Amino acid sequence: MSKVLEQKQQVVAEVAAKLRDSKSTVIVDYRGLNVAQVTELRKQLREAGVEYKVYKNTLVRRATAEAGLTGLDEHLVGPTAIAFGVDDVIAPAKVLNEFAKNNEALTIKTGVIEGNISTADEVKALAELPSREGLLSMLANVLQAPVRQFALAAKAVAEQKEEQGA
C-alpha cells in the first residue's frame, strides 16, 4: 500500500473515531472568512474545549459511513470545517452560533448531537439553551422558591403578632 493511501485511511479512522466519541459535532461552511476571523474562531473554540478542523469532504464521507452516520453526505459540499465537542454538548453549537451572528460568512450546515443527525435550525436552537451551570442554577432557584416564600410568610406572621402584642 502506498503511503498516501495509508495516511488517508488514518484520517478516515481518526474522523470516524471523533464522530463516535464526541457528544456533539457541528459542520460549518467557512467560505468568506479571512485569516484573522478564522484565527479568532479557533481561539474561541479552543477556550470552550472544542476541537475544530478542516478535512477533505471525500474523507469525511468515508468516515461518516464508517461511523454509521448516513445522511450527512448532502451537507459535505464546498469548504467544510467540523467542530467536535467531547465534553460539552452545547459548547460547539453555542460558540459557532455566536460567531455566525457576528460574521455572516460562517454558516452552520448541520450537526450530530449525541449520535443523531440534526438540522442547522436544531443546532441553532441548541445553541440558545443556557449552559449546564445555568440550568442547574435555575433548578436551584425553583427548588428554593417555596422555602423562601414560607420563610417570608412566617416572618410576616411573626411581625404581625409582635405588632398586635405591643
UniProtKB/Swiss-Prot annotation:
SUPFAM superfamilies (alphabetical): Ribosomal protein L10-like (SSF160369)
One record GO biological process: translation
Keyword Metal-binding carried by entry: no
Cellular compartments per GO CC: large ribosomal subunit
Presence of keyword Ribonucleoprotein: yes
Main function: Forms part of the ribosomal stalk, playing a central role in the interaction of the ribosome with GTP-bound translation factors.
Stated family: Belongs to the universal ribosomal protein uL10 family.
Name of the featured protein: Large ribosomal subunit protein uL10
Organism: Shouchella clausii (strain KSM-K16)
Gene encoding the protein: rplJ
